[in-house]
Amino acid sequence: MSMGGGSNHEFGQWLDQQLVPLATSSGSLMVELLHGNLDIWVKEAKHLPNMICYRNKLVGGISFSELGRRIRKVDGEKSSKFTSDPYVTVSISGAVIGRTFVISNSENPVWMQHFDVPVAHSAAEVHFVVKDNDPIGSKIIGVVGIPTKQLCSGNRIEGLFPILNSSGKPCRKGAMLSLSIQYTPMERMRLYQKGVGSGVECVGVPGTYFPLRKGGRVTLYQDAHVDDGTLPSVHLDGGIQYRHGKCWEDMADAIRRARRLIYITGWSVFHPVRLVRRNNDPTEGTLGELLKVKSQEGVRVLVLVWDDPTSMSFPGFSTKGLMNTSDEETRRFFKHSSVQVLLCPRYGGKGHSFIKKSEVETIYTHHQKTMIVDAEAAQNRRKIVAFVGGLDLCNGRFDTPKHSLFGTLKTLHKDDFHNPNFVTTEDVGPREPWHDLHSKIDGPAAYDVLANFEERWMASKPRGIGKGRTSFDDSLLRINRIPDIMGLSEASSANDNDPESWHVQVFRSIDSTSVKGFPKDPEEATGRNLLCGKNILIDMSIHAAYVKAIRSAQHFIYIENQYFLGSSFNWDSNKDLGANNLIPMEIALKIANKIRARENFAAYIVIPMWPEGAPTSKPIQRILYWQHKTMQMMYQTIYKALLEVGLDGQLEPQDFLNFFCLGNREVGTREVPDGTVNVYNCPRKPPQPNAAQVQALKSRRFMIYVHSKGMVVDDEFVLIGSANINQRSLEGTRDTEIAMGGYQPHHSWAKKGSRPRGQIFGYRMSLWAEHLGFLEQEFEEPENMECVRRVRQLSELNWGQYAAEEVTEMSGHLLKYPVQVDKTGKVSSLPGCETFPDLGGKIIGSFLTLQENLTI
């Protein structure tokens, strides 16, 4: 028995797409929307054909079966294959929603595998595709189709069904699949009817690897630093005033106070970065110096960084790499110290084809951003505290809510200039402002973040000549053997009677190639809520957390994310792209259902003006094209609901859903008569000025890059992590990710019976204060139409100021995303502004030929 199947280039994409090249019904079937959950059992198959018989055709004198035997021998697998190695994929609208494990050498396999799957798909059938696993490419044995019309009755459909071949006939006499399937629509699911943080008894997100942990505390951060007094005060319940956290200062303080361990994961970790920046005080050490000092004090310091395959370091030769993560430079800095740095490549799964392994190792990354330390606890003991979010400890990330373009180049951002969108320098600018979200977990859930680090560290293997000589197996401290460090069961930092206590849950996108500790037995893995992929096990709990929170939302959703694309199965074209995450469709259907119920609801989504890089480049134009398709699908879903209830003449889709971006503009001397550029009253010749740089200096404007990965629901639930809203971050087999979701049980709608005003309310209001420049009472009720229209009005005014010829100082940064949405939900270019100011590139993107998995 093994997990998942082999590669399948012939019939579909790797994990998320299953094209069915045959008819399972002789007549036309009605397309139905399934929005809810499918409860599925794939039980067993009988009398499957022996697929080896179909493969014994010669290729260069070698039969397919012999070729497969040789491949398995190279991979170290047993080569005794006499018949089919069957497994089953379950798909709807071409999107794979479930996959059984492989049973080797069996024509009568028994799986007895259960799936409880969220769906938001329009389809005529649910397909059960029986396949034969093989190293040179899985083959479809046959298909069973269950009409969605039958499922909509709500009755359980079960029994033995004939497995049909490409001719619509049984693939073999007596070939049958035993299955059971039942559809439960959203309106009948109690799990989603009481809100996200439904009181003390809430169980969190069910079916995940890490459970909900009660009795914690959470600190929420916006940007790397917030100066005192720069944002308006926000008053919370209980007479408390919201405190704006100082993320990097808190992280530096946590490092200094650590006595036992400091564990860091990152997409990038850069040793020269300064976490504390007050008046550019040179006495504040760099991250690298701080970690070396702590290591010399006896603290175990482990740093786990993604190994960019394009960066290399050999004696006398080194390359930075395409992604500029400085991984090799950081490794060299710590080489002769007691700080242990492990550059961790992204590896493909065992049994994957060479093409698939190459794709994983060159395209996908380790994207988690965490720091775990021991901290002071009661009775002279220590406890585990964890930081989780979107901020890497590297250059270009430090910023404040002011998001200056030019004014901090010689102070806060001296030696930390970052703008990869076009060629410019720190002498000239503008820098790329950076907006991000982060969190600190104090309590039992911090131990799950620690467990994630330990599982990843044990699975990581260095790459390259000389990198494998040191053993990393004994580097991890055995926490359970250190008496002064509290264990998980002792770690509660607050009880349920404390009004400031939190319930927190840790989520991941990761697979068994990147962790050590997942169960070997696929059936046991199912009990740990892991999914089967092709020869791997998958934790997709970040996606599950987003879906559960959106479905439970009763009032509003506020999202900040670096990317926003998905639900391609419901686009008007490119349905088979494979960007199958449910998040955009779930938001659109949530709004549509609220419209039908004639209840207020609003979604606010903040994204970057464009993905980082040259907006005219092929990859970015293609991402923008997918983003446009996603927006179009959502707005049209909302318009259909308005039309259905007869409100299309009174309301429009933007009364419920709005997209925004962030930008800034700074007044200052632009160009002096002799052609030099005046920066800080010190004229300098710009090095080889280019058109984009000249235009940006003239206009004194630039986007604020939204790197956030977070969501607030109903001011009672927050989700913050490293995952973007795209397939790369949510599928579990691509980029590795981590996130936290949490709420305060005493500050929920269920507990109060009215609007909660706890820490999450304060956080969301503080973010709005940063983006809009001030607060109004209307902002306290985001679901109300008055608030939606007011925020949109302000964002349109800000966009007008940003795009104007005249340079004026901007007090608000929230810009209406520059597309036009008409009353029928059609999304098109903004008249007179089809391309991005200064840098160009179509705002709605272009369909360009490029490897799809790179851009979704």
Curated annotation (Swiss-Prot):
Q: What induces it?
A: Activated by wounding, heavy metal, methyl salicylate, osmotic and salt stresses. Up-regulated by aluminum stress.
Cofactor annotation: Ca(2+)
Q: What is its EC number?
A: 3.1.4.4
**In its UniProt record, which GO terms are filed under biological process?**
lipid catabolic process; membrane lipid metabolic process; phosphatidylcholine metabolic process; response to oxidative stress
What residues sit in the active site? 367, 369, 374, 707, 709, 714
* Cofactor details (free text): Ca(2+). Requires micromolar level (PIP2-dependent).
Quote the entry's note on domains: C2 domain is a calcium-binding fold, and the binding promotes the protein association with membranes. In PLD gamma, all the calcium-coordinating acidic amino acids are conserved.
Q: What is this protein called?
A: Phospholipase D gamma 2
Its source organism is Arabidopsis thaliana
